[in-house]
Structure formats: structure tokens, C-alpha cells
Amino acid sequence: MLIMPVIVLFYKENGLSMQDIMLLQALYSLALVIFEVPSGYFSDTIGRRNSLVAGSILCTFGFFIYSLSYSFSGFLCAEMILGFGYSFISGTDSALLYDTLLEAEKEKDFTRKQGRLSATANFSEAAAGILGGIIAVSSLRLNFYIETGIIALSIPVALSIVEPKTHKNLKPKITYKGFCNIIRETFSDPPLFWLIACNAVILASTLTIVWFVQPYLEISGIPLIMFGIIWTVLNLSVGAASLSADKLKNILGNKFSFILPVILIITGYFSLSFMNLKWAFALFILLYIARGYTLPVFTNRINLQIPSERRATVLSIRVLLTRLIFCIVGPVSGYISDCFSLRTGLLFAGTSFLLLGTISLAGLLKYQNRLK
């Protein structure tokens, strides 16, 4: 995305504080929390393709509103639409990939394929980072105009998708009882619940750090044009971690493949809170590696526990928990950053993720032998 390397600067240019920025993102997360699981159920019942088309249209409209907005209220309206739109996409994309591989009897390749998909997305974002940084020198808003056009291209792509027979043949019906049953079964299954919970904590921590990178670079005196280059390197590290996730998981084994990302995020946050600014870039890379490694590894293990007719809904529950955690940690850490310092905000976030990570990891390790 062209906007991400400089989005915090864009917010500040339009009068938002760090607390405002974190609150805005928390409200976006709240929109995802509200719509995420119902839209996942929509994907499981109406179809993956239809869900992706709806999400693409809504996201295009959301970015269009963003490009015309100049205040917190305008940005909030855009974020609500984007939250609604993205809820149709998140979970559905991974479910579509897994069901396609399942139909071809290649589901064992999911971690590698998901890693490649994540890597491709991050390599694309890395390239966009350089371009976004260059464009931002002339105008921060211009990135939003161009981004709207790029997102619009996803609509014809979504329309061209062929639904896998694995899902088409199921033809489940939309019922409130069926929806509630999936929720209840997920939360009453300890191995699956703790797997999702641990993954959600890790993803929430890597989501939170994204909003600290640009302010950290700003107080370090980094030139604006370098923001895009740094963003590019960070996304390349995510892509590289995603590509190597399958091999690294096989080397580490199941237990340590769960422990590694938790160690990385805790080390990264606390080191950023106490160490010299010159080491910040290496520490950000550490956290971004955790992000790239986690998605394919945990998503594969979650997929192994659930049937196709529940897949998108359960994967959406993971996103719901991720955003719920961010809704709490994000705004509070932003408020602390405004009132005290950026490092103090990072320390609060790190302490929160240490506590949540330890609890969820302990639960996961307790039940790991019952996972498929």
C-alpha cells in the first residue's frame, strides 16, 4: 500500500495526535470486531467469491472517502467502511486457498503456499513503500488518490475467481443457530481456542508496532524520503520470513514453532523501550519477522482443526480476537506516548503482550498434543 510508509505523518498533517491515531485504528478494529465473524459466516454460506467481491467494492469506496477527508470524523467514516469491507476478505482468502488445495489433495502444501502468498503481498508492499515515500515528498494526500485506483482493480480480479468444488458442494444454509453453534464449538474446544488466542496475541502485537514505527523514525530525525525505503526493508523482512516459515517450522518442531514468535515480540518491545535509538531499525525487523513467520504457520495449524464449512468463520474469530486486543492496548499506549514518551508507550504495550502472550502460550502448550 502506497499510504502506509507515511500514513502517521498524513494524520499529523491533518491535526491528529498519537492518541487520536490509535483511537482511530481502535475504532476501525471495533468495526472489524462487529462485522468479522458474521462476514466469515457469510463466506462459508454464500461463497468465497461473493465475499471477496463485496469486500473489494467496500474497500474501494472506503479509500475514496479517505482521499476526500481532512478531519478525524471524515477519517472515521472511511475507516468504518474499510473495516466492514476488510471483514469480508480476512479469513476468506486463507479459507479459499486451503479449500482449493484440499480439492487438489495438496493441503499439506498450505504452509508453503500461504508463506509464498504472504511473501508476494509483502514484496509488493515493499515496492509500494519506495514509491509511496517518493510521492509523499510532493504530497501526502496524492498517495490516497492513487491507492483508490489500485484497490479498484481488485474488483474485476475477485469477479474472476472460481469457487472450489470442495466448498460449492457443501451448500450450507444461513441460520442463526448454525452461526451460534460454530462460535460455541470454537470456544469450547480448548486446543483450538488456545491456538487461536496465542496467534491473536502475536498478530495484535505486530499490528500495534506498525503505528509506532513512523513516530520512532520521526524523533530519530530520519528524512521523509527515507521512510519509504525503511518501510520497504521492513516488508522485505516479512516476506523473507513468510517464505522460510515452512522450513523453519520443520526445524523447530511444533512446540518451539509456537514459542519463537512470542519470544521475538517480547524481546523487540522491551528492547525498543530501553535501548539506544540507533538499534531501533534492527529491533523493528525482529518484530516484522515474527509477523511474517506467524501467519502461515498458525493458519495452517488452525485449518487442520476445522472442516471447510466452518473455515472462514473460525479464521474470522482469530481476526476478531486480534482486533479486540488492539482495541484495548493500542489507544492506551497511544495516550501514554502523548502524555509521557514514545518509549513509555512501547513499554506499556510490551508489558501487555508479555502478560497476554505468556497466558495464551501456556494454554496452547498444555493442549498442543491434542492438535492435529
Model-found features: residue ranges?
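C-terminal ends and interior cores of transmembrane alpha-helices
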Residues: 57-70, 75, 263-276
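C-terminal transmembrane helical hairpin of 12-TM major facilitator-type secondary transporters
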Residues: 255-298
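Helix-loop junctions on the cytosolic side of multi-pass membrane transporters
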Residues: 140-143, 147-174, 362-372
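Helix-loop boundary and gating motifs at the non-cytosolic
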Residues: 1-34, 189-232
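Helix-to-loop junctions at the C-terminal end of transmembrane segments
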Residues: 34-47, 136, 240-254, 337-338
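Cytoplasmic helix-loop-helix junction between adjacent transmembrane helices
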Residues: 80-122
